[in-house]
């Protein structure tokens, strides 16, 4: 993060408890800038908040985005209260501005928001033990089940065609043809990897068109590090980063969780010998996910869960490679060839999944 901000003047527009003391940058995620605001309460206690600058270059209508988050978290809170849970820890809680809004728009046209900090819980960039993935699966399954009676029509489509893999492929081919930075000649193998799987990009899109898959309220970005894990119990307690909550497929959420969770390395690991799809981790997540929400899904949704894991991993790799070809304009990079490294990493996982697809299917059907 190259730019510095006057955090105190920004945060003072929100209804915070205590006196603002310090702020720390929180370097995590590819899209928004995130910071931790530390306040001191009346009795000297530490109160933390999460401050974020919404990336309005990507999220073209932050007002609609925040309305989605507000509606979804309000619905989830009601469910948590019905279940005698803790609504302050089990979902995101928006801190309103002094004008009663869910965001603050400063004079530089930046959009800022604040959430309560969830204490006693952590996120993990990589799975440290299989039990974490089982409990993450339970948390995501619970998230989908809690929203199963939410009216999808109430949600804005904040990023149209976000997981439309057919259109993603068309955009990828456009990037190859334009070759803005002259990089295509050096990544022919990776480009061919994508082209050889073009038919895969049509499968779920066609099923939606044929009304074979129901649209649900979905998270659409269920990386493992978007699940808060309780530090004491090891249970998955909350699903966070709700910017892409909109109508979608349950398959998207399952698939992206496997992409980020059932791997032996970070998504930008350069040494591909360290990057492997872990079938045991896949099974732990599938077990938790289906235990929590399996009875809410249709036969076709269940059948295509394994394929969705491969497709979401493929889509992510394709997007990384497209961004590399376009000159690294979407995902934040921290080194040369960062997006290319990410793409190769994801394609290695896709290859592994293709070899394990029969076993992946057997695992799903063993838990329904």
Language model features with spans:
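Secondary-structure capping and boundary motifs in well-ordered enzyme cores
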Residues: 107, 214-219, 246, 277, ...
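Active-site Asp-x-Gly
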Residues: 229-294, 334-339
